[in-house]
């Protein structure tokens, strides 16, 4: 945001329903609902061609948005992008006891690496996620894509970036792997790398 302000580029950011300052309960959120949030911002607030930057689940959302609005999205930058995480990194990793519990109670609490309290995963999140999986078939993208992923990410394996590159139909897909980088990529060097990626993409598609 500071970089965009400094160079005079328009910038929009938002919290999904149930996140940050937005209303709603996190446990009521689903990939589909957050996709609707993304399209509402893209259609109702952001004007003109857009470069989307998404981190983790936001990376899944940017890919969905680019597929839904190909005429609006001219570039994508993913940071530890996590498409299909509800299926590949949650459901398929749950043991039988966890699967039985979430199916019976509708919610499962998992330990968090970032908070003292566990975070909730709803059955609705898992089931709805199956309607939005992207890595099982070719993913139609008509714009440049730059994926940045830390190689010691313990939440989303770096191989996910390669999977995205493999299914994306765009001829312009690049992957930057950060040796020693974790999931959040929030160190000063990581932010400088992201800033450079944003500026390079902006110059490439806009200027």
Name these PLM-found stretches.
Residues 45-56:
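Alpha/beta-hydrolase fold nucleophile elbow
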Residues 19-47:
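Catalytic nucleophile-loop/oxyanion-hole region of alpha/beta-hydrolase
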Residues 168-184:
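Catalytic histidine neighborhood in serine/cysteine hydrolases
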Residues 1-23:
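Conserved alpha/beta-hydrolase
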Residues 181-207:
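Catalytic active-site module of serine/aspartate enzymes centered on a nucleophile-bearing elbow/loop
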Residues 140-141, 147-149, 153:
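Short beta-strand/loop motif that positions the catalytic acidic residue
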Residues 71-121:
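Hydrolase active-site cap/lid region
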Residues 154-160, 186:
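Conserved alpha/beta-hydrolase "acid-adjacent" motif
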């Amino acid at each position: 945001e500071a970089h965009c302000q400094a160079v005079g580029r328009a910038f929009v950011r938002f919290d999904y329903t149930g996140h940050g300052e937005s209303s709603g309960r996190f446990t009521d959120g689903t990939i589909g609902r957050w996709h609707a949030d993304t399209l509402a911002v893209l259609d109702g607030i952001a004007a003109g061609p857009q470069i989307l930057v998404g981190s983790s689940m936001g990376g899944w959302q940017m890919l969905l948005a680019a597929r839904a609005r190909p005429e609006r999205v001219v570039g994508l930058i993913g940071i530890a992008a996590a498409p299909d995480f509800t299926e590949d990194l949650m459901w398929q990793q749950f043991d039988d006891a966890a699967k039985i519990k979430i199916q019976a109670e509708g919610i499962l609490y998992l330990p968090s690496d970032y908070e003292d309290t566990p975070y909730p995963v709803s059955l609705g999140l898992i089931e709805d996620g199956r309607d939005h999986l992207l890595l099982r078939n070719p993913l139609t993208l008509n714009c440049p894509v730059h994926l940045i992923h830390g190689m010691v990410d313990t939440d989303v394996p770096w191989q996910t970036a390669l999977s995205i590159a493999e299914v994306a139909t765009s001829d312009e897909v690049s992957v930057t792997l950060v040796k020693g980088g974790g999931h959040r990529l929030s160190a000063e060097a990581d932010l400088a790398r992201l800033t450079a990626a944003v500026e390079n993409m902006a110059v490439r598609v806009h200027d």
